[in-house]
Amino acid sequence: MKRKLDANDVPSPEAADDSVKNDVDNLDFESLNLDPRLRQALVKEKFTKPTLVQAKAIPLALEGKDILARAKTGSGKTAAYVLPILQTILQKKANDPSLKATTGLILVPTRELAEQVQNVITTFAAFCGKDVRSVNLTQKVSDAVQRTMLADYPDLIVSTPSRVIANLGSSALSLENLTHLVIDEADLVLSYGYDEDINALAKAIPRGVQTFLMSATLTAEVDTLKGLFCRSPVILKLEDKDDQGSGVSQFVVKCAEDEKFLLTYVIFKLQLIKGKVIIFVGDVDRCYRVKLFLEQFGIKSCVLNSELPVNSRLHVVQEFNKGVYDIIIAADEQEVMGARKSKKSKEAEENDAGEAAGSSDEDEGEAQKPSTTRSDKPSEKRRKTAGKDKDYGISRGIDFQNVACVLNFDLPTTSKSYTHRIGRTGRAGKTGMALSFVVPADQFGKHKPTSFPTAKHDETVLAKITKRQAKLGHEVKPYHFEMKQVDAFRYRMTDALRSITRLAVQEARAREIRQELIKSEKLKRHFEENPEELRQLRHDDELRSARIQPHLKHIPDYLMPSKGKKGISSENVGYVGFRKTSENRIRKAREKNRGKGKGRNYAGVKKVDPLKTFNRGRK
């Protein structure tokens, strides 16, 4: 079709955008010519229309083209590469039913994301019988078991780069027949310290492999991966309505360090936020401090702890998605506690042209400020990170469903991390809210028990967050609490915080790890042979993580604001006794010892009358 020329004899711009959008809106999975078994699985999962990234990427993938796609996490990127790969595998099996070869490799940065991708593959291959076999190499199984799993040549492998290299080195895995390579969350793979593994993998992969690079941002790491694996890829910079973040309302509250706990208590106890909430904090200790604090008021929550096994963490996410818990507390340690980053990432961390998101120098400064304080104590950093799962990550990739609010209890150290955190809510066209606590510089360090080092730079980081969000067309608005009404709850917050000591936090962490040891399948036989060790793990009654005060669970009417009384019905308030449910341990011990003759209560000692008894008093 010919286009009209303007006054300068230049063709007028094509009005293709609207037509493309209309084509995407009218497109359905039937028109993609997928295998009937895949369409049946899509119908079962109630997938009616493809998302923007699926509508764009799937036809290109079926044509055999390399794809570099930038789309928001939660936009359907996983299905965009899983469906074409499954389609290709089914076509090959139709031509040669006896074919046994590993043709697809999916690389992800974290174990949680690997499990999530594996579940998606299982869902879409539900009606394919034995024609499609996939293996997740990040599972905690022995090398011998993994070798057995790989000996049957599964069609698809989901793994982190380090596990692939380990199995290539032991000759358990062969990539000779590989036809599809996917690197999901490509901008994170190098940031998580997989540089050497990726370079080794680039040499092991045969030429002509179709490559998918899926990423939320186009950074220096993505350019590096594109140079290693892609052949003139089709670049998709997809800006859906959801990608603009229009559904997320962003608010910030400036408060003192102890007021973070006070406001958190008021928010959840008065039910100011309805629905599921993710609370992001600075580290694991902080997770348990917040959890124990909420427990004082009868508010249930769960902790996503990087020290626990991957299956336990996945179970926590599943329980949260099912609605068992409405509050999940997480420490995004890869970003907050200092993830290993490549030089290119540090130099151009925010040079994402598609997002127009500020200069790299800004975020470099953001990342360096907290790190300078940590670098003064290298031994402490090594001790803290020891035992943490390298493949752990929370703010990216994990599919948290129906999150109403993201609460940044501790502000992240970079604006990029902030963007990824708030991306957990307002997904798939839904609305959401992000609320961040910011400690002013003059308030930092005034309440030592609740202080956190990175809060020193909160105002600087907030300025950069505001600037970045403004460039993206979003506004970070101030949120004001009526402090006169909030202050009425302060004494209850103080009572609760007083019982949550550093020792209580350590005991809570130790107890959860002991519970995981008891649940461990691998240790069951060991405990059967050594029942005494199991008994020691279970009998931990003396470890009281925090003194529970039952009266804190109930809010008296005189404390309730007039508007708050309507929000909480009397049906939700259970019986709360005004007497202590357990005796005073110290008083009970004194009485017991007094009966045994241990210690003397001089005020209560009766004088011995020698005329009434033959027992002489002690000289």
From Swiss-Prot:
ATP binds at A71, K72, T73, G74, S75, G76, K77, T78. It holds the Pfam family Helicase_C. Residues 587-599 have a biased composition (Basic residues). A motif (DEAD box) lies at residues 184-187. SUPFAM superfamilies: P-loop containing nucleoside triphosphate hydrolases. Its EC number is 3.6.4.13. Keywords: ATP-binding, Helicase, Hydrolase, Nucleotide-binding, Nucleus, Ribosome biogenesis, RNA-binding, rRNA processing. Residues 1-22, 340-391, 586-619 are annotated as: Disordered. GO terms for biological process: maturation of LSU-rRNA from tricistronic rRNA transcript (SSU-rRNA, 5.8S rRNA, LSU-rRNA). One of its GO terms (cellular component) is nucleolus. It catalyses: ATP + H2O = ADP + phosphate + H(+). The Q motif is unique to and characteristic of the DEAD box family of RNA helicases and controls ATP binding and hydrolysis. Belongs to the DEAD box helicase family. DDX56/DBP9 subfamily. This is ATP-dependent RNA helicase dbp9. It comes from Aspergillus terreus (strain NIH 2624 / FGSC A1156). The lineage of its organism: Eukaryota, Fungi, Dikarya, Ascomycota, Pezizomycotina. The gene is dbp9.
